[in-house]
């Protein structure tokens, strides 16, 4: 492989979850929230070995006495000190590997600032001393995971949604579109909808309850207006949810009004296009000859595409925009929550990929900017 025969480590840094594992595996070994928690009041946790900060699941479990922070916002690392803690946790606690012995593949959102990639590279080589490193674009990896080399990926995670047209394994840079509207915004919007019926969730800890409600109960309506009408006429579709304190709340039309935001960002006053228009616009930026293949291979990826009914609705909305003779096919792989990671696992274990790594020697010679030459 590279310097040694150690398998590569693949880390998919999401705004909401960090997925990590060993190249060649078919699923990540660790998936934990990208959260750092610091005690609200130092010295309050009696009888526990108080740490200055908690990472991932542990922060999640103690969220009542912590202030929670996400170091990745909209797919971009905003706090490198916190991010370092997450990577450290990844290597030493979750995977139990020494980074000095393994090549490391990280992922990033398309159109990320150049400085962001350089800092990532610098941290990996200088803090963790990895022997070699690579950074790949998330959507391209998702397409690999679905077994295609041509298609358009609609990738929606916790912090950013993007549509990336890919032809023969190469992302077409002019046809990459992104909106900063994703899972975290849906969670906020869900809080707002529940507030309207008198349920007030506001703290960082309660937000996690809302996220759970969103993931368990929400779905995308095929026809929004008629769905609204159906809920007004009967309460058969209402679902109850038990809160951690034992109380039960009833979730009504919020179940589909929340994910509807993906198609109508105007609900929260955003002037973004919805994901159907984003997909269509991205395809229209491509060459006429390629469009047929793209319409026929719309691949969903990321946790925010896990809502039941989303594939059918996207297919319906894109069909309304596309030429009438065009065949539209939306692919929703069941493992799409992890497809970016799976694509990274496939890519980094290919024998043809082994020459692509940035080695420590190359980094020492050229500095962090080498990442723009070797990873595109």
From Swiss-Prot:
PROSITE patterns: ACTINS_1 (PS00406), ACTINS_2 (PS00432), ACTINS_ACT_LIKE (PS01132). It holds the Pfam family Actin. It comes from the Eukaryota. CDD domains: ASKHA_NBD_actin. The keyword Nucleus does not apply. Its EC number is 3.6.4.-. InterPro entries: Actin (IPR004000), Actin/actin-like_CS (IPR020902), Actin_CS (IPR004001), ATPase_NBD (IPR043129). GO terms for cellular component: cytoplasm; cytoskeleton. The keyword Methyltransferase does not apply. Its main location: cytoplasm. It catalyses: ATP + H2O = ADP + phosphate + H(+). It is an enzyme of class 3 (hydrolase). Keywords: ATP-binding, Cytoplasm, Cytoskeleton, Hydrolase, Nucleotide-binding. It is found in: Cytoplasm, Cytoskeleton. One of its GO terms (molecular function) is hydrolase activity. Belongs to the actin family. Actins are highly conserved proteins that are involved in various types of cell motility and are ubiquitously expressed in all eukaryotic cells. This is Actin, cytoplasmic.
